[in-house]
Amino acid sequence: MKRLEVSNQAKLPTQFGEFCIQCFREKGSNGSKDHLVIFTPNFPQNPLVRLHSECLTGDALGSQKCDCGGALQMALERISKEGGLVIYLRQEGRGIGLFNKVNAYALQDKGYDTIQANEMIGFKDDERDYSIAGEILEYYRIKKMRLLTNNPLKIAALEKYAEVTRESLIVCANEHNQGYLEVKKLKMGHLL
């Protein structure tokens, strides 16, 4: 926990059920970044875990361009029933930040896919770093988990810290995100 400062725990009643929250402040050369963990009290030894990167447009604004908001809601619903946690990482836009994400969205509006748009503004298709999630898993002493994901990069990253069994999390396509989901499957190797 050398690069993390840990907050107190607080209760968080939600539409999905009762959770607790705790913040992890990542200290680094670029200042600090706060990540949030939402968890059920007394979660099981083999908990459901959702590693979720921040998506303001999908999570808070209900954007139909992605599957993020739906995936987060589905994860919270399942976790409230089965026990576990969501590690909510502040890595907006697959790690490029909100400003750049909006610029990438503008390119998508012109017909470029999500990967092409990121590359056109100088980024890789995915700039995220999941090592901080590994440190958070170690903090909670999680050695085995059922990971709610379709992303093979998340599986590979977390297998360094715990035994991972993947459980799929499928959000229905709509007219606005169908192409995005196809790119995730065909170009990014997502297990959809």
From Swiss-Prot:
Highest taxon above the source species: Bacteria
Cofactor: Zn(2+)
Involved pathway(s): Cofactor biosynthesis; riboflavin biosynthesis; 5-amino-6-(D-ribitylamino)uracil from GTP: step 1/4
Assigned EC number: 3.5.4.25
GO MF entry, a single one: GTP cyclohydrolase II activity
Chemical reaction(s) catalysed: GTP + 4 H2O = 2,5-diamino-6-hydroxy-4-(5-phosphoribosylamino)-pyrimidine + formate + 2 phosphate + 3 H(+)
Binding positions (GTP): R50, L51, H52, S53, E54, E92, G93, R94, T114, T149, K154
Record key words, sorted: GTP-binding, Hydrolase, Metal-binding, Nucleotide-binding, Riboflavin biosynthesis, Zinc
Record-level GO BP terms: riboflavin biosynthetic process
Binding site for Zn(2+): C55, C66, C68
Cellular component GO terms, alphabetical: cytosol
SUPFAM superfamilies registered for this protein in UniProt: RibA-like
UniProt key word Hydrolase: yes
Residue positions of the active site: D126 (proton acceptor), R128 (nucleophile)
Cofactor note: Binds 1 zinc ion per subunit.
Protein's job: Catalyzes the conversion of GTP to 2,5-diamino-6-ribosylamino-4(3H)-pyrimidinone 5'-phosphate (DARP), formate and pyrophosphate.
Protein family (similarity comment): Belongs to the GTP cyclohydrolase II family.
Record's protein name: GTP cyclohydrolase-2
